[in-house]
């Protein structure tokens, strides 16, 4: 309707104010149908005062939300927590809200236009800042719970919950980082979500939030520990992306400040991630020294979680690259047992990867394939891009060893398509790259260059689910 007067570009720029743009409709229609604002306003007028109040307050949610979140964030000052369910049900009956099922349970959602109308009313009440703080506090609490429960049998539930809550977690992060006194909360929230950035395929987004968080100056007493955690998590993400220079800078700052403030946990994490950096840059003796020291520090302070187990897996990888396969197997079997005792599935997948590497190195491709299939299934369930692509890379080598060079080349094409969403392929590491080069050389020899390239291109065209199923 507006294209007679405006270009598509002008329409796009004006869509931020949908109520101003979408006005002046069919003059033969009822007055309440002629503009978007009066159409929504008609529904608003039909609501009771408590319904209008809840509508306005629910506008602070940036995506789907559950009942518990609505009760916490929106109650008080004229709306008791025990009344939220009844008022919310009335808004559902009037289609102000919609109800949806998700892997994280029953959720509620507002259409963006309905939400924008409520947000205008919330601003008019003068209560918007308080509601945004309550929204922030709820999601900081949710992230705290999810980080603790990641190391438990509820790992799948946690992954689904954070995925469903991501729009609201982003909104909470924005609020923390925009508020003058919210820097320490932003650093805390960005760091607490490490398992999602690293374990659920969100490396680039995690890097975005963490870099913003560590640039902010927080109150020393309130934010020191949160800043240290944000620094080592930022370094972890950058290492996995193959970006070693900013990773090293963050780790050096973290270690220096952790020692100054006598924070043994932050020292251990900084040392652990420095060992991980040495591993992916092929300095294996230094990696082994640092990782053993970090694991000793973890034991001294009683730390046991998925990060600690990953440190042991990384130590096993360093031992395997140096030729000590029995020690690598011992370390990863221990991790596997701890994971089974605690219901941990994510770190277990990386232990299976190292065990598969050892099985292939010892000439047992059948055992290696069995372990890698298990590893890949778990990584795919969590959407862990790094775990998935490492498993596919090694599966390609196992496949060529079993005599199917064409399928091995297809799998290399699959891996080639996956690496850009992670970072630098195989971290730029000669040791991690060795299986890829062995596979490529064997496949090219058996297929010829032209057929090899054709198979790689076929693999690169496969979607993620199709590739994993294959």
For the regions a protein language model found, what residue spans apply to each?
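Tandem amphipathic alpha-helical repeat scaffolds
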Residues: 187-201, 226-244, 265-283, 294, ...
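Alpha-solenoid helical repeat scaffolds
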Residues: 89, 170, 174-177, 211, ...
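Acidic, Ser/Thr-rich low-complexity linear motifs
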Residues: 146-161, 382-385, 420-438
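Eukaryotic all-alpha helical interaction scaffolds
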Residues: 176, 197, 217-218, 238, ...
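Aliphatic-rich helical/repeat scaffold segments used for oligomerization and domain docking
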Residues: 1-215, 386, 392-394, 398-410, ...
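C-terminal non-catalytic interaction modules
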Residues: 406-470
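Short coil/turn linkers that connect adjacent helices within long alpha-helical scaffolds
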Residues: 179-181, 219-222, 256-264, 296-304, ...
């Amino acid at each position: 309707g507006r294209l007679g007067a405006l270009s598509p570009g002008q329409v796009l720029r004006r869509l931020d104010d949908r109520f101003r743009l979408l006005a002046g409709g069919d003059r033969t229609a009822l007055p309440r149908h002629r503009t978007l604002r009066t159409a929504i306003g008609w529904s608003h007028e039909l609501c009771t005062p408590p319904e209008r109040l809840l509508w306005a307050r629910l506008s602070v949610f940036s995506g789907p939300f559950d009942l518990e979140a609505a009760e916490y964030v929106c109650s008080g000052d004229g709306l008791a927590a025990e009344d939220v369910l009844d008022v919310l049900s009335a808004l559902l009956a009037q289609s102000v809200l919609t109800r949806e099922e998700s892997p994280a349970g029953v959720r509620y959602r507002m259409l963006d236009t309905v939400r924008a109308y409520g947000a205008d009313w919330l601003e008019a009440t003068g209560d918007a800042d308080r509601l945004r703080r309550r929204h922030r506090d709820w999601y900081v609490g949710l992230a705290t719970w999810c980080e603790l429960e990641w190391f438990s049998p509820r790992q799948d539930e946690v992954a689904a919950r954070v995925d469903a809550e991501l729009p609201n977690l982003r909104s909470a992060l924005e609020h923390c980082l925009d508020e003058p006194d919210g820097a320490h909360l932003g650093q805390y929230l960005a760091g607490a979500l490490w398992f999602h950035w690293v374990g659920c395929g969100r490396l680039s987004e995690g890097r975005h939030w963490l870099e913003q968080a560590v640039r902010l100056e927080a109150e020393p007493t309130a934010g020191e520990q949160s800043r240290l955690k944000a620094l080592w998590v930022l370094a972890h993400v950058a290492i996995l992306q193959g970006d070693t220079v900013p990773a090293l800078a963050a780790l050096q700052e973290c270690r220096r400040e952790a020692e100054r403030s006598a924070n043994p946990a932050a020292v251990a994490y900084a040392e652990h991630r420095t060992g991980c950096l040495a591993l992916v840059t092929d300095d294996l003796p230094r990696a082994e020294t640092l990782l053993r020291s970090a694991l000793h520090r973890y034991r001294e302070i009683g730390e046991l979680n998925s990060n600690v187990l990953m440190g042991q897996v990384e130590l096993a990888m360093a031992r395997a690259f140096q030729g000590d396969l029995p020690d690598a197997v011992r370390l990863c079997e221990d991790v596997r047992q701890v994971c089974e005792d605690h219901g941990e599935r994510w770190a277990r997948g990386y232990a299976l990867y190292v065990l598969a590497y050892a099985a292939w190195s010892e000439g047992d491709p059948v055992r290696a394939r069995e372990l890698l299939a298990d590893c890949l299934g778990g990584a795919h369930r969590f959407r862990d891009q790094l775990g998935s692509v490492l498993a596919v890379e090694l599966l390609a080598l196992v496949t060529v060893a079993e005599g199917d060079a064409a399928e091995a080349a297809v799998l290399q094409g699959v891996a080639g398509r996956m690496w850009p969403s992670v970072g630098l392929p195989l971290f730029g590491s000669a040791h991690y790259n060795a299986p890829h080069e062995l596979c490529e050389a064997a496949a090219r020899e058996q297929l010829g260059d032209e057929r090899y390239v054709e198979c790689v291109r076929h693999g690169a065209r496969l979607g993620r689910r199709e590739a994993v199923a294959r």
